[in-house]
Each structure stands twice: as C-alpha cells, then as structure tokens.
Amino acid sequence: MISLAAKTASIKEPKRSSALVRQETIASYLFLLPSLIFFLGFVIYPMILCVVTSFFDSTMNRADIFVGFANYAELFADPIFIGALRNTFIIVVVSVPVTCAFSLWVSSAIVDLPEWTTSLFRCVFYLPVVTGSVAVTVVWKWMYNNYYGIFNYLGKAVGLIDKNINWLGDEKYALGCIILILLTTSVGQPIVLYVSALGNVDQSIVEAAEVDGATDFQCFWRIKWPAIMPTTLYILVITTINSFQCFALIQLLTSGGPNHSTDTIMYYIYYTAFKLYRYCLLYTSPSPRDRQKSRMPSSA
C-alpha cells in the first residue's frame, strides 16, 4: 500500500511555459527600469566622469588639459589634503565607537523604564537630529563663544580654567569641539534603534537565564547582544557614513580654520571645486601655494 507521503512526493508541480517565464522576467525588468536609469544617471555616470576628469587640469577659464597622473601626485604632495585626511580619520575613529557605545548604554538604561519615560528620553535625544543644522550650529557657537560662552563661564566657575578660551579659534581645541557637536547630533537615531531592538528581545529567555543564576552582564552579553547585532551593524554603517560626510558644521563654524586644523575631506572638496573652480576636485587639488594665497586661516 502506497503511503500518503509517497503519493504526495510523486505529484510534481506543473511546469510553467517558457513564454510565461519570459513575460514575468520582462515585467520584472520594466519595474526595475526607472530605478536602474536613476542609478546609472546619478551614480555610475558621475563616478566615471570623476575618474576621467581626474586625468585633466579642469578649470572654468580655459579648456581642459590632459595631465595624466600629475593631479594624483599633486594631491598627495599637498600638506593641506594630508591634514584634511588625518582630521577626517580622527573624526571617524573617535565619533563612531563613542556614538555606538553611548547609544547602547543609554538605550539599556531607559528601555525598562515606564513607557512615557522612555518616550521622553527618546524625544530629548532625537531632537537635535530633526532640528536644522544651522539652528544647532548657532546654539553651539554661542556656547563656545570666547567672551560670553557658557563653557568659559562654567569652566571658570568650577575652577577648571583661569581665563577665557577661544574654543573655535585655537588649533588645540577646534577639532575636539567639532567632534563634540557631531556626537550630540548623531546619538539620536542609534538610541531609537537600540531601544526598539532591545524591546524585541525575547524576555522569556532572559527570565530563564536569571532563574538559572545569570548576572545582568551575562544576560546582556549572551542573550541581548547577539540579538541586536544586526541593528549594531546598521548603526556602525550609518554612523561611519555620517562621520565621513561631516561638512555643515565645518562650513558654518570654522570654515576649516584655524590654520586648516578642522579641514575634512568633504570641506576640502567643496573649497577646491566651488571656491577655486578646479573641477577635478574628487581626486585632485590646487597646489599648496595657490590654496594658501586664496584662503586665509579662519578663526572664531
């Protein structure tokens, strides 16, 4: 007697015709076509154009001149570019781990609070994200002011400093001030994501581990941390991208000064392209001499 499982296994799905498969494939590509056109026109083509332009001396006042790899040699010989590269690396290395660690700590502390309290904390930390960068910059510029800023006032009040410090006009402090602002505007989204991820962890597993004698750290490290790893990876990616793209704070606060101490790759590209009009900006730069003549060091 043939079993029911054998009968079921012997039944094969009807094979679809090649015409139907071809029709579905064409329909799929037609749905994909608008996005593909946008991707080719606004991503792939500009990338190819940038690579081609990097082999020319391209300015607005004359025709492009083919120079081969001279632009690359000039770029890496420019100490201002090397400084911008170093500053960008410092911003990424400092801001990414600090943002992720602080966001995870805050989220772990507020996730078990009453719902209205958790929502309040999320709103407070997310407020700088939805606030315009210009408004945020104006507030921080007032706080950093070397005459009446709140940092100088509090520093002298508690005895940390003896005299006012020009926070944005001193090479020793300017980049650190930029990183501090970037941190306050970057933790909002990770906190919201971490609170959501921690709230989705199966509490029955956590309770079972606690009954077996697991400590809070062991519950976090063995149960919660693996569960929120996908969220952590996403946060690391977006935080790294945001750190590399730090531009508005630099432009509005220091313009790369003082003495190029807050230059980043994004601001360097902007200044080279839209101030000096050298459109091989993504891979080339003006000479250090030309750049120094055309730009005075900025200070707060």
Regions found by a protein language model. Name each.
Residues 1-21:
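Short, Lys/Arg-rich, polar N-terminal cytosolic tail immediately upstream
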Residues 23-285, 289-291, 295, 300:
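A structural signal for multi-pass alpha-helical bundles of membrane permease subunits
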